[in-house]
């Protein structure tokens, strides 16, 4: 029998419940939007039970089972607990007040961020002792890709010679428009699609008339392209119209691919977009299916959200994936060269910057004075003999308007450009300026265009058989001076040729987003760099391509290169954690290119690359297989990190599924065991702790070498680390002090542990801040 206090509680609960029901019913006609209700770590292993609990929560608040079913978009039930549902703003606020709910936030959208890459990085298929052969090219490793889908007919998904599907694979091949289970094989072992979040936010979307396929099939080509880079099979004799010829393959060519399509083409806007709700569901399914590596070439824009904020769906999903042993690799973004633009900055994600290759597409321009200038283009049409060259400008005796600015060529009269090669200048950072200039000139009857622009922006294919050649402003000015000084200037354009090797330097791409990390300045981002400029890989047969292959540029292309390397490392070291894999990649990276030359960062002006451009450096796959020491981390480290940056204990507890109490005083974020040290606000001195784990020879002795940042003193204690059968982990302290007396920018150095076989290097990035939290505009 109930006592008086219990009876009162029941009555009050019923009253509150009925009032909530009534208010929810009254709001049913209000505008509903997709909201993600994040509940943290799942409390039950049975996914059906988890989903039922989600429906019960919605049912109790919406008033009926039918309304709950209509509202539900997704149930996240494998890697973590939560759901996406269509709710009014008021309904979302009420659900957010429930004690089991960590966050409720509106759905958000993400945007999409080879033949030479692997030979350039030293990952040779011809060397029988290489990492490729030591790991049997990634066999039995599953790379999950979240993107625009897959074109299964491409030869890069050929499963010839493949053994059985890995026993830990639990996924499947989902059917849909122009896609059925027969499109999967032993290479492409899984394909699923997630569209509910996209549909809920785009009610006018007409799936019948849409160009996109309502299935795992790729329309855009982006998903097929990045899958090729990560794990595509060998396809010989591939080129782009005769350029960049060779064998296309992925980093782990015998790894298995699972595609999770979460990005969709919106016909009305002519854009491809990815709902956070769909991405989270794709990650949830990938965790269930058994992927070993997740490759995500998507990103949001700054300002960023914190790591426990569900608004960054990739960060939240990645946290749960990493705790399950899945390495998550993400693109760093294409908003460079400005600082503070890098995205996907969570400390459990490997964030990737993009570099050029040692390859260019030289296009000879011969002026009438016999001077030869090597421009850049992807022009494979017939050579153009000596032809009149013009820079549209007012000669001083005309009332007509002339412009040599590329964007304004359309305002020139046709007779200005007809039958000529046109020189123009642009300050635009975008490849579209090149294409637009070519269109204007061709429309006017011109025969070619030379575009002078800032160096560093990726060369793109132009109009078919129409020469559009890029030069920098310096060379463009040389051509302009010749044009002005000659009575009858002419130019000859020859087809482009592929140059490979030492004459072509490696650079961090202009578009590659830069650090420092805007959300957590003590966490170095990006982590690592990989080639991402003019990468030749497979695409769909619905896109402009050659032989079903196309060249694309972006950190989207760099991230899957690291995913391929991570797959090889996982195949070689099955017991390594995602943090150990990241450490091995970062600490063994090249600080120079493979030929020993300095790596520059493109921009205005170009400069020597530093950790905010490329993290630890340019990935060195062979060295990463045997790093000697690793900076490892697990759940306890991530909890200490979240405590150190001020996240509340309740959020952390729900995130990890168990009670968390942060220490008082709270730990220092500088002690987070990253393979880097970044100090954003040093006033006088600080001492930092790191722990390294020996993964090399059992009995090893390492000695430290420090290259201190300019104006800083760095002391390491102890200076020697000794490992044996009983000592596999050792911690050391790093004391950093500044001699600067004013607020400074960042200075860079490095710390290296060396034995006779290994050099384990981490970057140091330090800024003096005598006056804290101060913005200086002077």
Swiss-Prot record:
**E.C. number(s) listed in UniProt:** 3.4.21.-
Domain Inhibitor I9 per the UniProt entry, residue ranges:
34-113
The record's section on InterPro entries has: Peptidase_S8/S53_dom, Peptidase_S8/S53_dom_sf, Peptidase_S8_Ser-AS, Peptidase_S8_subtilisin-rel, Peptidases_S8_3, S8pro/Inhibitor_I9, S8pro/Inhibitor_I9_sf, SBT
> What residue range is the signal peptide?
1-22
**PA domain span:** 388-483
Protein name per Swiss-Prot or TrEMBL:
Subtilisin-like protease SBT3.6
Q: Where in the cell is it found?
A: Secreted
What is one Pfam family matched by this protein? fn3_6
The UniProt similarity line reads: Belongs to the peptidase S8 family.
Molecular function terms, GO-annotated = serine-type endopeptidase activity
Active site (catalytic residues): 147, 222, 556
Occurrences of domain Peptidase S8 (ranges):
117-625
Write down the glycosylated positions. Answer: 69, 158, 180, 202, 206, 237, 399, 414, 541, 648, 724, 759
Q: Which GO BP terms apply?
A: proteolysis
> Which PROSITE patterns does UniProt cross-reference here?
SUBTILASE, SUBTILASE_SER
Propeptide found at 23-113
* Keyword tags: Autocatalytic cleavage, Glycoprotein, Hydrolase, Protease, Secreted, Serine protease, Signal, Zymogen
Gene Ontology, cellular component aspect = cytosol; extracellular region
User: Which organism does this sequence originate in?
Assistant: Arabidopsis thaliana (Mouse-ear cress)
């Amino acid at each position: 029998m109930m006592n008086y206090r219990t009876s009162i509680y029941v009555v009050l609960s019923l009253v509150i419940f009925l009032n909530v029901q009534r208010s929810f019913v009254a709001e049913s006609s209000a505008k509903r939007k997709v909201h993600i209700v994040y509940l943290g770590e799942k409390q039950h292993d049975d996914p059906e039970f988890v989903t039922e609990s989600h429906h019960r929560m919605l049912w109790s608040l919406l008033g009926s089972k039918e309304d709950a079913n209509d509202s539900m978009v997704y149930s996240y039930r494998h890697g973590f607990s939560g759901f996406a549902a269509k709710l009014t703003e008021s309904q979302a606020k009420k659900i957010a007040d429930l004690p089991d709910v960590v966050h409720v936030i509106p759905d958000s959208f993400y945007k999409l961020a080879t033949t030479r890459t692997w030979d350039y990085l030293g990952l040779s298929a011809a060397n029988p002792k290489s990492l490729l052969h030591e790991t049997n090219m990634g066999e039995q490793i599953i790379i999950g890709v979240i993107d625009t889908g897959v074109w299964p007919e491409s030869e890069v998904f050929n499963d010839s010679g493949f053994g059985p599907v890995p026993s830990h694979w639990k996924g499947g091949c989902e059917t849909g428009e122009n896609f059925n289970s027969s499109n999967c094989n032993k290479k492409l072992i899984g394909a699923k699609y997630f569209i509910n979040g996209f549909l809920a936010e785009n009610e006018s979307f007409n799936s019948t008339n849409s160009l996109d396929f309502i299935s795992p099939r790729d329309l855009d080509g982006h998903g097929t392209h990045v899958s090729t880079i990560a794990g595509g099979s060998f396809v010989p004799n591939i080129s782009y119209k005769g350029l960049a010829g060779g064998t296309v393959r992925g980093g782990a060519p015998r790894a298995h691919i699972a595609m999770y399509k979460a990005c969709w083409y919106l016909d009305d806007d002519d854009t491809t977009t990815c709902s956070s709700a769909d991405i989270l569901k794709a990650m949830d399914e990938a965790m269930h299916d058994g992927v070993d590596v997740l490759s995500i070439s998507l990103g949001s824009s700054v300002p960023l959200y914190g790591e426990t904020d569900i608004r960054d769906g990739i960060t939240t999903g990645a946290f749960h994936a990493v705790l399950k042993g899945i390495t998550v690799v993400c693109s760093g973004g294409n908003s460079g060269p400005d600082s503070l633009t890098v995205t996907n900055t969570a400390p459990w994600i490997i964030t990737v910057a993009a570099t050029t290759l040692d390859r260019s597409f030289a296009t000879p321009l011969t002026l009438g004075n016999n001077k030869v200038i090597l421009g850049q283009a992807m022009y494979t049409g017939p050579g153009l003999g000596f032809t009149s060259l013009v820079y549209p400008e007012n000669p001083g005796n005309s009332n007509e308007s002339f412009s040599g600015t590329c964007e304004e060529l359309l305002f020139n009269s046709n007779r200005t450009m007809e039958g000529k090669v046109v020189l123009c200048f642009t300050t635009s950072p975008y490849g579209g300026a090149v294409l637009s200039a070519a269109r204007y000139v061709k429309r006017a009857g011109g025969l070619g265009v030379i575009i002078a622009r800032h160096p560093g922006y990726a060369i793109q294919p132009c109009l078919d058989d129409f020469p559009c050649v890029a030069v920098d402003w310096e060379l463009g000015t040389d051509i302009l001076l010749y044009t002005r000084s000659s009575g009858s200037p002419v130019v000859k354009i020859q087809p482009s040729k592929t140059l490979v090797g030492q004459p072509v330097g490696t650079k961090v791409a202009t578009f590659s987003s830069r650090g420092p990390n805007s959300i957590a300045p003590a966490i170095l981002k990006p982590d690592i760099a990989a080639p991402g400029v003019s990468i030749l890989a497979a695409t769909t047969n619905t896109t402009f391509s050659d032989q079903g292959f196309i060249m694309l540029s972006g950190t989207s292309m760099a991230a899957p290169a690291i995913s391929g390397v991570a797959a090889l490392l996982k195949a070689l070291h099955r017991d390594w954690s995602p943090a150990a894999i990241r450490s091995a990649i970062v600490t063994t990276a090249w600080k120079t290119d493979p030929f020993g030359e300095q790596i520059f960062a493109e921009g205005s002006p170009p400069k020597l690359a530093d950790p905010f451009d490329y993290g630890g450096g340019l990935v060195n796959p062979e060295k990463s297989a045997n790093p000697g020491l690793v900076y490892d981390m697990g759940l306890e480290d991530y909890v200490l990190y979240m405590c150190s940056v001020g996240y509340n204990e309740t959020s952390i507890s729900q995130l990890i599924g168990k009670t968390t109490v942060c220490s008082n005083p709270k730990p220092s974020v500088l002690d987070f065991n990253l393979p880097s040290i970044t100090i954003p606000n040093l006033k006088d001195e600080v001492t930092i702790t790191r722990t390294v784990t020996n993964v090399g020879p059992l009995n090893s002795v390492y000695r430290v070498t420090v290259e201190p940042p300019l104006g800083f003193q760095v002391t390491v204690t102890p200076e020697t680390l000794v490992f044996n059968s009983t000592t596999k982990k050792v911690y050391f302290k790093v004391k950093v002090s500044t001699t600067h007396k004013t607020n400074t920018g960042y200075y860079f150095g490095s710390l290296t542990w060396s034995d006779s076989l290994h050099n384990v290097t981490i970057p140091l990035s330090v800024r003096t801040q005598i006056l804290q939290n101060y913005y200086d505009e002077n």
